[in-house]
Amino acid sequence: SYTPELIEGLSEHRDVLPVKEVVLVDINEERLKIMEGFVKRFCQHLDYHVDVWSTDSRKEAFVGADFIACQIRVGGNKQRIFDEKIPLKYGVIGQETTGVGGMFNALRTIPVMIEIAKDVEKYCPDAWIVNYSNPTGLVTEAVLKVCNVKMAGLCAGGMRPRWWAEEALNVKEESIYYDYIGLNHMNLSLIHISEPTRPISI
């Protein structure tokens, strides 16, 4: 789950993105209650004052929402293992966002995301859907072709090369120019280190 990372990001940017309420939705009630308890404790730890509750009803969660953050994995981790291992068995990329595994993942995920988007159309038509569900690009494009919603596909992975460069080269964040083109596992990163003693481009 990306929920802890998402909550931490909202907390870090609370001055520019003042969130009042976070509603967690899951089809697995046991997992949902565990995550709700964790998020409440995490918010206390971060001194982040936001109402947190959970439900298994999309209607209940969506009414009045401004943003819907989706991070679903249809078939769970068990299916992800198949997506990654079966292609490898035949000598092709085994991965959840590209190749054969990515396509299988997309074929399972897109119909469910369309159902979710149709509920957004019905219960909160002005809300933005922020999609973290892989393969992000395919899923987002498919939903936008079928549904009348506002939607963006995102991946936190885009910032990782910058962080790795900072650590590997032992440079400060402000000395790095970072340009990122693409999404998820289909991208090009340009990193330029502008410290006077050693200008480097990667």
Spans of features found by a protein language model:
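Aromatic-residue-lined binding/catalytic grooves and analogous aromatic/hydrophobic interfacial grooves
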Residues: G158, Y180-L183, L190
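Single conserved hydrophobic/aromatic residue that forms the stacking wall/gate
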Residues: I191-I202
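Metallocofactor- and cofactor-centric catalytic cores in central/energy metabolism, strongly enriched
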Residues: S1-Q79, N105-V171, N187
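Glycine/threonine-rich flexible loop motifs
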Residues: N77-R108
